[in-house]
């Protein structure tokens, strides 16, 4: 049997880049909660003892940026300089301006355009992907890498492993076979976890706890064998972490946010962007389209691309490929997609309820992936049943 290895990585919520994603989306939530028409392009960067938010925001909302930054960092677990950042005493810098009037008139006509007329906030192309290898219709390498990161955070916060600190990374390599275009996982080849820890714990204790409390609950035992390789804190020491260890920036974990290297990516990040930014809304609707194709039994694996021009409502192109796993021709699947999904930015916002912020709606997306999540706030995960015409 011919097989191949494929690897996906993830980082947990204490990684500096992910901290920035969460701050940017917490600010988006605050704006949309009070003013659903808010136009938000919010970036965040961080380094030792400092978090800065900057970008363009036009909103009627009253937003306490500094409080949001501190609350978000505290919620992650950055409560002292020892762990990488002190939420209550770090410097918070804010440099927010209004959206460019040139962009505003071209995209939404200074809020005068009807929803179906609202243009894309920028040019670009986005991809959605789905595969039948997991119940979430997501790649297994990505699902496990992501769940390992989430489990690391869980056992840190519930004090199962009190030596853990917020920063951490995971990576999973799976051996697959190609079944006529569909991906079939056979076994786990390698599990890699690098997690920040305190000064007291030994490397042996780290390895033992990670196997027992993180890997065992996430990866079913039938995928692990005597040849599975475990790299558990292979560098030997990871005490300094978070923004103290590395600078962080919004939008630097776009593969972790999506499909773990499977499918394709148009390059646009998600966090800190309101739904007129098709980098985000376009990627969400093509995930819904690809997932619906697979869930409807039309293919075992599917990728969908959409592209836009700034200020233009209708997409420039829509593309589908089922990797030769389709039960009907790809051109017929494309027709079904175009008939069942409205790719105009204003209509995507309505149909996917993307103008609703608050209650951590967008902040939740900013750690542990935007896709494959079982949460009603992730409206783009809702399947539309697609039926070919008889």
Curated annotation (Swiss-Prot):
This is S-adenosylmethionine synthase 1. It holds the Pfam family S-AdoMet_synt_C. The keyword Transferase applies. It comes from Nicotiana tabacum. L-methionine binds at residues 56, 99, 246, 277. InterPro entries: ADOMET_SYNTHASE_CS, S-AdoMet_synt_C, S-AdoMet_synt_central, S-AdoMet_synt_N, S-AdoMet_synthetase, S-AdoMet_synthetase_sfam. ATP binds at residues 15, 167-169, 235-238, 246, 252-253, 269, 273, 277. Mg(2+) binds at residue 9. One of its GO terms (molecular function) is ATP binding. PANTHER family: S-ADENOSYLMETHIONINE SYNTHETASE. Belongs to the AdoMet synthase family. Its cofactor is Mn(2+); Mg(2+); Co(2+); K(+). The keyword Nucleus does not apply. Keywords: ATP-binding, Cobalt, Cytoplasm, Magnesium, Metal-binding, Nucleotide-binding, One-carbon metabolism, Potassium, Transferase. Its EC number is 2.5.1.6. Pathway: Amino-acid biosynthesis; S-adenosyl-L-methionine biosynthesis; S-adenosyl-L-methionine from L-methionine: step 1/1. One of its GO terms (cellular component) is cytosol. GO terms for biological process: one-carbon metabolic process; S-adenosylmethionine biosynthetic process. K(+) binds at residue 43. Catalyzes the formation of S-adenosylmethionine from methionine and ATP. The reaction comprises two steps that are both catalyzed by the same enzyme: formation of S-adenosylmethionine (AdoMet) and triphosphate, and subsequent hydrolysis of the triphosphate. Homotetramer.
